[in-house]
């Protein structure tokens, strides 16, 4: 059916009809043609005059009276014309007045508002799911009411606009199977300068098994589609998209945990005593006052002993009055204000919540009489309180008889009381909105959704949530790393969603998903006229069974920025995409798209997804991806079961290997390095947070467009201030490619599965012959990733300002880490549950915490692999092993077969006292297995300055590696390591057709300590390679566990000019050799400088002529001796010389009768060639002075690096701690320490604007001086830090002064043994801050060291304006690359 209300000649709110080709340079999407007043109505002509009667003929004589008559007639006509003009004027005025009055003040015409275009006609199509609507050219409709239609097609010159008004009172829902915007058509909901205020919903309907529903070519079903030349402008109300917590929210909402109790037949009076400052249940007891007068008296005595202010909850169970003595009743009446206790009868249900000393005004109680084993409901008492930190909580007591069963219960909880403190102004978030709080633990499944409640007492940076959190969510910088949870708004006032079935059906992968995954989708095709989307919500979008059906898909759009001729480039801004069934935002063969402030939550498959490996210049700015689950579409989306069970695209019979080919689902899947990531957060994925993967050529629908992408050679785009956490495999992953060929018998793996053969090696202009370009990873925050914080492999890569082949692929490249902070076990201990499988003891503090794998999994701060890698100017904290687990600051890849270069170097490192294991080389056992693979044995690094080992310019290697030792080496038993001086390089020993052999290498100085290597390749490979690290200037023998290989190549790796090693290779004694040297040029894959080796007659002769190309074959020992000597210089990090890779090639001709001999010549070689052990480079003296310049220069690594944070620490001491010989009580401010050496109080104040310490004062007691200090001695806008030592006089008296410094109420400090207080005095007096907190302990408990990172110069502090505001580097970078 076609709807046509007739043509219109009014101005049209659409772009030029022919798409990109006809856009003017000044076209601004969302702007309508200026409103013009309608042309004035033509005035009706005056009534025709009667034809004049000719006067009678008379003489032409001048006559005065006749002339006067003519004047009078003329005046009459003029007056008549004047009346007519006045009438016309008032008519026009009346028309305008009617028009204006017909528009309320809220609808004053605004040229930026599409719904106010006078060309629009009201449209109310009604509800008919069979009605097919086509909007033709010249038809411009304003949808004024909800509608249900089969489909809408907006053709060239047609437009649809959703109605709106200033109050946002519209609530329009459009249900349809699809909306198709064709060339020249337009759909508008709001505009960038006229935000949509009402509620607009587009519901896309349909099932995947509706075969009668025809698919639209290129679009499919259940979609909103934009064809070439179409316009889509959707702009909801501006709202904060996502922000961070600024105060930790504990599980249950209460730091001490909630309390719930319910029991039948708990006879007597049940009691709970609750700390009014913390909500902790202090006493949990039952008193059988029915049976025992002693219990009754004990209850009375306990109540009398409680301090004033303590919360008490009482509830009867079964019967409570038979032996409830009068004195106890009187105590309950006097202390708790009960009015019912004296009149309780047998089996009455009674409940009370009150405050000691609060009298009747603080008492809430209820009683219900017992009759026929029933009380007709609960006796319920409930009161609300708040902690000293301002957290609301409820104490409930209840008692009931029902169906002959008595029930007693208590609850202490924060249900509907939890307030979230947030970093940004969220006054645009409203009650009823849905939000999600990200996990800050290992499991991404600890992300939690909440509904917002009204909160009249909240400030603009606070919201109150319904219910309570199940898990802890960190809201602060811990141990120097920003671990604040992301908090995202899911609700928007423009919603596009798929209408879903209640469960999975048909062929929608129901074996993997129990729910319907056939959602709606939005597809944008190339050469559109205008597409801008902002502040909209996409829910239940994407189709898991169908490729190319994503929540938002820019499909082969080409350049969508100014390079593509768009004066206003396309963008996606502040979208909420959640509960999606296939990705979040797909950028497919599209360049220059800006995606900012967008949330992708709970999706199947890669979330922010670059598809074909040719997408470039796209900008991802301040986006959030969390809870990214596996999907089925691509091998890289799949988990184990999907990988092995979906085999329709592998070669017949092949079963994929999940770890190698699948299991890569990521929140950000970046298929080409020339894209920009700034201030994004990947807060939970089944595999990786951000994965840079490489394509050899364009893939997918773009297959064949670009035969060679050179992605591995392309410089990295901007990477700044991104964060990755709660990901199972890795936070950041830069490695591997996807397979770009179909499955064959030769390679049965599926097209686009993972492939391990890529190495990122960026060069200028993607040309390997031009200089390398370092990839800069600037400001990476990584924490709580199960396996790896970051896995980065390839060319020159530099990581800075961050918190957590047979040859290397790119000659001369290296990876570098600087100005970074590594934390082993942070104070973020996590919450047991939420699919966290492991819960165990921490090594630093001995407290229970979540663990990444199990309790034995080794935790490594900086993991050395391959190389060369360099780390310097970095700090390590909290690496301490347990009895079950090794936790080390510096470690190595587990079960490593690969090479480790001695050029890996470390320097200027700082280790916090909480680091008790600086380095570890593994031991046989869990996770390390036998610890005997080639890479395990050759683990080594260069300690440049001794900051890790204490010996400058030394090498640290595994303790049992005697290829690198000398007698002066220093053993490090705890590390399973040894520290040695010397020069070290590698020889790669490559053999042909002998890959099943093991190689035994002995140094002549330690012949009884050989190293046995298996080789890095499989036993069925055509060649094998062994990669030992050798001390230069020493001699070695090499032996085989089988027949010697016919062809062996020795490659000199990391040799400096004139470095040498004397090598003796074992062969049968009748072997004939052809030995040559050459230089391998990797650039042209050729060999140069080929020279033959000649024989000499003795080892002594060989030693004299080591500069020459000579060899000696000792037939008696079976050893072929020759020098591996570098003749050319090596530059920088190059592993080969400047001339190329120097090699020695040995072709052995072995007699037929000796071809099966096992060539192990050890027995003949020694003691003949044994030598005394010695060092070439003397061991340095140990460092004696601490390195003051070592470590990272920053104290805090935050996700808002333009803001400054103050590191503050408070260590208070109780009397018991002093008795236990702890003598340290102090306050530190950015490492400036103020000691408290005697019993008393220490107060330090800091200017909250500059971070400068303004005062530090010690008081032995709360005397008049200290009181005066509290009253007048603290400057406005001051951070106030308070520590205590011992038990000074008037300890509890300090409480009265803390409320004015940020405490939510006057705390109870009676019986407390230590205090640590972080407070703030605002410009106008008390100004509680999210970081303000009071910590106390009593009895045998201790506070320990308390640390807070406090933000400086917040807007709330009312600091004076600065001359130079901090530079927002993220915005500067965005401006630069946009």
Curated annotation (Swiss-Prot):
Record key words, sorted: Angiogenesis, Cell membrane, Developmental protein, Glycoprotein, Glycosidase, Hydrolase, Lectin, Membrane, Repeat, Signal-anchor, Transmembrane, Transmembrane helix
Enzyme class: hydrolase
GO cellular component: plasma membrane
PROSITE patterns per the UniProt record, alphabetical: G8, GG_LECTIN
Phenotype of the disrupted gene, per the record: Embryos show defects in heart morphogenesis: while heart development is normal at the linear heart tube stage, cardiac looping is lost at later developmental stages. Defects during the endocardial morphogenesis, characterized by the formation of ectopic atrioventricular canal in the ventricular myocardium and endocardium. Maternal-zygotic mutants also display muscle fiber detachment, associated with impaired laminin organization and ineffective fibronectin degradation at the myotendinous junction. Defects in angiogenesis, characterized by embryos with no venous sprouting.
SUPFAM superfamilies listed in its UniProt record: Pectin lyase-like
Annotated GG-type lectin domain residues: 257-414, 1203-1363
GO molecular function: calcium ion binding; carbohydrate binding; hyalurononglucosaminidase activity
InterPro entries for the chain: CEMIP/CEMIP2 (IPR052252), CEMIP_beta-hel_dom (IPR055401), CEMIP_X (IPR055400), G8_domain (IPR019316), ILEI/PANDER_dom (IPR039477), Pectin_lyase_fold/virulence (IPR011050), TMEM2_PANDER-like (IPR039473)
Pfam families: CEMIP_beta-hel, CEMIP_X, G8, ILEI
Comp. bias intervals (Pro residues): 36-58
Predominant cellular place of this UniProt entry's protein: membrane
Function: Cell surface hyaluronidase that mediates the initial cleavage of extracellular high-molecular-weight hyaluronan into intermediate-size hyaluronan. Acts as a regulator of angiogenesis in embryos by mediating degradation of extracellular hyaluronan, thereby promoting VEGF signaling. Acts as a regulator of heart development during myocardial and endocardial morphogenesis: involved in the looping stage of heart morphogenesis. Stimulates migration of endocardial cells and increases both myocardial and endocardial fusion.
The protein's name: Cell surface hyaluronidase
Organism: Danio rerio (Zebrafish)
Top-level taxonomy: Eukaryota, Metazoa, Chordata, Craniata, Vertebrata
Gene encoding the protein: cemip2
């Amino acid at each position: 059916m076609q709807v046509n209300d007739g043509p219109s000649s009014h101005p049209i709110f659409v772009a030029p009809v022919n798409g990109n080709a006809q856009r003017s340079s000044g076209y601004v999407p969302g702007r309508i043609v200026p409103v013009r007043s309608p042309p004035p109505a033509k005035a009706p002509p005056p009534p025709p005059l009667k034809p004049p009667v000719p006067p009678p003929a008379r003489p032409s004589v001048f006559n005065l009276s006749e002339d006067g008559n003519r004047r009078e007639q003329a005046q009459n006509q003029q007056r008549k014309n004047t009346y007519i003009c006045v009438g016309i004027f008032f008519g026009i005025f009346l028309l305008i007045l009617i028009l204006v009055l017909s528009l309320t003040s809220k609808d004053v015409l605004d040229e930026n508002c599409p719904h106010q275009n006078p060309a629009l006609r009201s449209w109310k199509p009604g509800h008919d799911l069979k009605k097919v609507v086509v909007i033709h050219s010249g038809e411009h409709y304003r949808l004024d009411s909800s509608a249900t239609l089969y489909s809408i097609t907006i053709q060239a010159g047609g437009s649809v606009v959703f109605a709106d008004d200033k109050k946002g009172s519209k609530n329009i829902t459009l249900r349809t199977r699809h909306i198709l915007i064709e060339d020249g058509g337009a759909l508008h909901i709001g505009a960038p300068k006229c935000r949509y205020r009402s509620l607009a919903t587009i519901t896309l309907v349909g099932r995947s098994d509706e075969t009668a529903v025809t698919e639209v070519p290129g679009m499919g079903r259940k979609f909103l589609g934009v064809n070439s030349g179409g316009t889509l402008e959707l702009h909801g109300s501006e709202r904060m998209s996502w922000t961070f917590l600024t105060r930790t929210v504990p599980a249950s909402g209460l730091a001490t945990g909630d309390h719930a109790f319910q029991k039948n037949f708990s006879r007597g009076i049940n009691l709970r005593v609750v700390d009014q400052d913390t909500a902790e249940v202090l006493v949990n007891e039952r008193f059988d006052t029915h049976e025992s007068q002693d219990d009754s008296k004990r209850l009375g005595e306990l109540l009398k002993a409680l301090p004033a202010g303590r919360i008490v909850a009482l509830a009867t169970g079964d019967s409570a009055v038979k032996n409830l003595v009068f004195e106890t009743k009187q105590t309950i009446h006097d202390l708790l204000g009960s009015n019912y206790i004296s009149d309780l009868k047998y089996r009455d249900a009674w409940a009370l919540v009150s405050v000691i000393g609060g009298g009747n005004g603080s008492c809430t109680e209820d009683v219900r009489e017992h009759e026929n084993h029933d009380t007709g409901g609960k006796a319920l008492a409930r009161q609300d309180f708040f902690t000293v930190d301002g957290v609301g909580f409820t104490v409930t007591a209840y008692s009931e008889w029902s169906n002959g069963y008595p029930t007693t219960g208590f609850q202490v909880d924060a249900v509907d009381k939890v307030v979230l403190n947030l970093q940004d102004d969220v006054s645009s978030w409203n009650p009823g909105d849905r939000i999600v709080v990200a996990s800050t633990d290992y499991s991404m499944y600890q992300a939690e959704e909440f509904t917002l409640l009204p909160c009249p007492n909240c400030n603009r940076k606070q919201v109150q949530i319904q219910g309570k959190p199940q898990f802890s969510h960190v809201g602060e910088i811990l141990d120097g790393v920003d671990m604040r949870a992301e908090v995202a708004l899911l609700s928007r006032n423009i919603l596009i969603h798929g209408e879903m079935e209640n469960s999975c059906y048909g062929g929608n992968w129901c074996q993997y998903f129990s729910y319907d995954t056939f959602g709606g989708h939005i597809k944008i095709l190339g050469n559109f006229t205008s597409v801008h989307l902002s502040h909209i919500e996409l829910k239940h979008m994407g189709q898991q069974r169908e490729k190319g059906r994503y929540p938002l898909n820019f499909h082969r759009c080409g350049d969508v920025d100014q390079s593509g001729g768009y004066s206003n480039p396309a963008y996606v801004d502040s979208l909420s995409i959640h509960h999606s069934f296939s990705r979040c935002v797909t950028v497919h063969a599209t360049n220059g798209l800006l995606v900012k402030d967008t949330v992708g939550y709970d999706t199947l498959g890669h979330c922010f997804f670059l598809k074909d490996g040719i997408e470039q210049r796209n900008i991802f700015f301040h986006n959030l991806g969390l809870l990214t689950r596996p999907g089925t579409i691509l091998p890289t989306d799949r988990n184990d079961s999907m990988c092995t069970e979906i085999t329709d695209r592998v070669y017949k019979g092949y079963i994929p290997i999940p770890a190698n080919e699948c299991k890569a689902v990521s929140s950000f899947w970046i298929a080409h390095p020339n894209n920009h990531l700034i201030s994004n957060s990947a807060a939970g994925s089944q595999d990786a947070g951000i994965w840079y993967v490489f394509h050899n050529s364009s893939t997918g629908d773009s297959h064949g467009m670009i035969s060679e992408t050179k992605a591995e050679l392309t410089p990295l785009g901007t990477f700044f201030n991104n964060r990755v956490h709660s990901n199972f495999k890795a936070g950041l992953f830069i490695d591997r490619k996807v397979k770009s060929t179909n499955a064959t018998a030769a390679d049965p793996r599926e097209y686009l599965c993972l492939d391990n053969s890529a190495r990122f090696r960026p060069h200028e202009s993607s040309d390997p012959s031009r200089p390398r370009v370092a990839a800069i990873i600037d400001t990476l925050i990584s924490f709580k990733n199960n396996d790896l914080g970051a896995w980065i492999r390839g060319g020159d890569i530099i990581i800075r300002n961050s918190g957590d082949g047979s040859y290397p692929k790119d000659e001369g490249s290296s990876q570098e880490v600087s100005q970074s902070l590594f934390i082993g076990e942070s104070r973020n201990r996590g919450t047991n549950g939420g699919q966290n499988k492991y819960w165990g003891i921490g090594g630093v503090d001995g407290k229970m915490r979540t663990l990444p794998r199990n309790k034995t999994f080794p935790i490594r701060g900086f993991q050395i692999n391959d190389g060369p890698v360099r780390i310097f100017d970095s700090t390590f904290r909290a690496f301490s092993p347990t009895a079950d687990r090794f936790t080390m600051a510096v470690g190595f890849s587990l079960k490593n077969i690969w090479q480790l270069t001695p050029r890996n170097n470390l320097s200027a490192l700082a280790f916090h006292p909480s680091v008790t294991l600086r380095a570890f080389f593994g031991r046989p056992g869990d996770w390390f297995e036998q610890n005997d693979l080639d890479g395990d044995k050759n683990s080594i690094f260069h300690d440049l300055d001794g900051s890790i080992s204490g010996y400058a310019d030394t090498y640290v290697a595994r303790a049992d590696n005697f290829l690198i030792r000398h007698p002066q080496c220093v053993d490090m038993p705890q590390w399973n390591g040894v520290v040695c001086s010397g020069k070290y390089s590698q020889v790669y020993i490559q053999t042909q057709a002998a890959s099943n052999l093991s190689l035994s290498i002995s140094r002549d100085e330690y012949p009884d300590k050989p190293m046995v290597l298996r080789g890095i390749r499989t036993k069925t490979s055509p060649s094998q390679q062994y990669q030992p690290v050798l001390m230069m200037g020493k001699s070695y023998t090499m032996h085989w566990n089988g027949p010697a290989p016919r062809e062996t190549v020795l490659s000199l790796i990391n040799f400096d000019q004139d470095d040498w090693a004397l090598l003796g290779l074992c062969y049968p004694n009748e072997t004939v050799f052809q030995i040559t040297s050459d230089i391998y040029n990797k650039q042209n894959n050729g060999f140069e400088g080929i020279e033959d080796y000649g024989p000499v007659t003795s080892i002594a002769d060989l030693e004299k002529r080591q500069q020459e190309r000579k060899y000696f074959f000792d037939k008696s020992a079976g050893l072929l001796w020759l020098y591996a000597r570098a003749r050319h210089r090596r530059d920088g990090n190059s592993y080969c010389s400047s001339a190329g890779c120097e090699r020695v090639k040995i072709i052995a001709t072995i007699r037929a009768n000796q071809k099966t001999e096992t060539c192990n010549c050890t027995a003949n070689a020694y003691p003949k060639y044994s030598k005394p052990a010695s060092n070439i480079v003397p061991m340095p003296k140990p460092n004696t002075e601490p390195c003051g310049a070592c470590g990272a220069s920053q104290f805090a690594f935050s996700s808002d690096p333009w803001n400054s944070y103050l590191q503050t620490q408070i260590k208070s001491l109780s009397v018991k701690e002093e008795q236990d010989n702890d003598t340290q009580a102090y306050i530190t401010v950015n490492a400036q320490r103020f000691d408290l050496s005697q019993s008393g109080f220490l107060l330090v104040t800091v200017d909250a604007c500059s971070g400068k310490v303004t005062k530090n004062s010690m008081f032995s007691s709360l005397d008049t001086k200290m009181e005066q200090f509290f009253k007048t001695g603290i400057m406005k806008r001051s951070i106030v830090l308070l520590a205590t030592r011992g038990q000074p006089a008037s300890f509890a008296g300090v409480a009265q002064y803390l409320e004015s410094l940020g405490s939510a109420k006057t705390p109870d400090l009676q019986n407390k043994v230590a205090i640590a207080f972080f407070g703030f005095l605002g410009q106008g007096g008390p100004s509680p801050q999210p970081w303000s907190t009071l910590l106390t302990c009593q009895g045998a408990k201790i506070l320990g060291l308390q640390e807070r990172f406090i933000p400086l110069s917040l807007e709330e502090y009312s600091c004076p304006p600065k001359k130079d505001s901090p530079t927002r580097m993220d915005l500067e970078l965005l401006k630069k690359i946009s």
